[in-house]
Amino acid sequence: MFWRKVIGYWKSILVLSAIAYLSLLREPSIALPSVPGIDKWIHGVMYLILTLTLLWDSQQRPNLWWIAGVFSAIFGGFIEVLQELFFYPRMGDWMDWLADCIGVIIAIVVWLIGMKLYEKRMVK
């Protein structure tokens, strides 16, 4: 039963693993464009994708949407702490975590609006 639930979240686990891997590389091999604030945009988009994936995988429990948001935000903070403590020369940054949380909030708003529109469409 436990493994069946885990397998049901394979997309979320894949996105979560990719974010952890990219965030914990000691020296990222991907050079970011020299656009001011691009790293914050990347953080926001990564956590928007993570949250939407969690919401998609947990559609059977539509009233627990907030758990996807809380989990994503806590995961973002955890990654920042790990970077600061164990992954030199990476540094934890509260502004990165704020960007993560903004991505989470946008994902939840988009999801809830989408679900309302879907429900209205199904009623007609």
Regions inferred by a protein language model and the residue ranges of each:
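Residues within alpha-helical transmembrane segments of multi-pass membrane proteins, especially transporters
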Residues: 25, 53, 74, 78, ...
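Short helix-capping/hinge motifs at transmembrane helix termini and TM-loop junctions
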Residues: 25-27, 59, 87-88, 115
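Interfacial helix-loop-helix junctions of multi-pass membrane proteins
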Residues: 33-37, 79-105
